[in-house]
Amino acid sequence: MSTKKIFEERLQELEAIVTRLENGDVPLEEAISEFQKGMVLSKDLQKTLQAAEKTLVKVMQADGTELEMDA
C-alpha cells in the first residue's frame, strides 16, 4: 500500500480534528498544533478534489474525441 494516505483516511482525520477543536477541551498549544495539521489536510484534500474534477470534466465521445464540459 502507498505510504500516502488515501483520501477517505485523510478526510476522517480532518473530521476528527474538527470535532476535537469544536469540543473546546483541548489545551491551547495542542489546539494550535491540531489547527495547523487540519489546515494542511484541508489544502491537500482540496488539491485532490480539484485534480479529480479536472479528470472528470473531460468525457470521451463515441468517436474518441474529448468533450469539454462546464465545471
Curated annotation (Swiss-Prot):
Protein name (record): Exodeoxyribonuclease 7 small subunit
Catalyses:
Exonucleolytic cleavage in either 5'- to 3'- or 3'- to 5'-direction to yield nucleoside 5'-phosphates
Localisation: Cytoplasm
Per UniProt, the keywords (alphabetical) are: Cytoplasm, Exonuclease, Hydrolase, Nuclease
Q: What does this protein do?
A: Bidirectionally degrades single-stranded DNA into large acid-insoluble oligonucleotides, which are then degraded further into small acid-soluble oligonucleotides.
InterPro entries of this UniProt entry? Answer: Exonuc_VII_S, Exonuc_VII_ssu_sf
Please indicate if the UniProt record lists Repeat as a keyword.
no
Q: Which organism is it from?
A: Streptococcus equi subsp. equi (strain 4047)
Kindly list the GO molecular function terms attached to this UniProt entry: exodeoxyribonuclease VII activity
> Which E.C. number(s) belong to this protein?
3.1.11.6
